[in-house]
Amino acid sequence: MEFTFTLKYQLSTQAGGDDDMLDRLAVEGCDDAIVGLGQPGRLALAFIREACSANEAVASALAAVRRAVPGATLIEATPDLVGLTDMAEVVGMSRQGMRKLVSVHSISFPSPVHEGRASIWHLAEVLAWFQGKGGYSVSQGMLEVARVAMQVNIRKELDRISPESVALATAG
């Protein structure tokens, strides 16, 4: 099965030149990705990877990038965090239709990760809700890769905080 996802990185000063890095990425198995170097100090890889599972696809890509660009720090795996417009696009409806749906189903719709001027949700939770509702076309591959991207991002954030902070957050 093919899985589509993007990995975004902050480059270290040891990343080397762009041509050298592109060669290392290809040698390490990232030849199934479109590479973006438009922002100085950043690297984005948009993969379409063949694998038995989304977990295998993303894990193999993460390992390949780690080998090719050892000092790079993962910023984000996508698709994960989405706003109303992104959700609407994924399920094939208008932004206004999505806003109304979220409002009408405010009790059962997944809670946002961030609520403010622009709210953000985990795509995996939203797709699972749509799948449970029925009547909406949800790609199983998209749901699977969104779940894996969410897990990668949560793990990355947990690794950033101290054990004491984790204990405090989970106490109770």
Over which residues does each language-model region extend?
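Short glycine-/aliphatic-rich beta-strand segments at the starts of folded cytosolic domains
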Residues: 1-13, 82
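Short beta-strand-to-loop capping motifs
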Residues: 9-13, 45-52
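Short, conserved charged micro-motifs
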Residues: 13-20, 53-58
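A short, structured beta-strand/loop element
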Residues: 17-42
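Conserved short beta-strand edge segments in small beta-sheet-based binding/regulatory domains
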Residues: 32-38, 63-80
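Polyanion-binding surface elements
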Residues: 78-101
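Major-groove DNA-recognition helix of helix-turn-helix-type DNA-binding domains
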Residues: 93-119
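A short, Lys/Arg-enriched interface patch at domain edges and termini
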Residues: 125-172
